[in-house]
């Protein structure tokens, strides 16, 4: 794989509005999307090299809780379901904060979640448990078929 191909795949992670994917594309795992998740978990092992402190542990815990709040309250409740109203500053801040949880952007997340609700637990539900445990939890977003933002769902 050429350096330009790798660079292009990294860039479209952030902006895939011009990416066209055929309906019949394979559900094979795209390993360029797996590498960041493997690296993210391997980096955690560096704690055995650099050590840890109670402050670092509290910062990690607070960071985790804040990111999960951003995903639950804003990505899920606000962007996907429009369950409450908020100002542009809160939308921006929690949208950026949620994206640091490596769950892509709020529009991508909301589009796939809305599609999930339309087809809940049927064949067109892209992360239904009917497709298997690993697929429903992480396989679905690591393949090219489900990579683009489903703009018609937002």
Which stretches of residues belong to each language-model region?
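Non-catalytic, topology-defining segments of multipass membrane proteins
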Residues: 1-154
């Amino acid at each position: 794989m050429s350096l330009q191909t790798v660079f292009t795949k990294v860039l479209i992670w952030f902006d895939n509005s011009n990416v066209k994917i055929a309906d019949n594309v394979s559900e094979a795992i795209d390993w360029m999307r797996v590498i960041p998740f493997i690296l993210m978990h391997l980096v955690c092992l560096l704690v055995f090299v650099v050590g840890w402190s109670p402050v670092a542990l509290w910062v990690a815990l607070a960071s985790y809780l804040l990111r999960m709040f951003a995903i639950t309250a804003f990505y899920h409740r606000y962007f996907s379901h429009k369950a409450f109203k908020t100002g542009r500053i809160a939308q921006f801040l929690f949208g950026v904060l949620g994206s640091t949880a490596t769950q892509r952007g709020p529009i991508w997340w909301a589009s796939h979640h809305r599609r999930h609700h339309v087809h809940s637990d049927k064949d067109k539900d892209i992360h239904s448990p009917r497709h298997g445990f690993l697929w429903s939890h992480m396989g679905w977003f690591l393949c090219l078929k489900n990579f683009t933002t489903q703009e018609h769902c937002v």
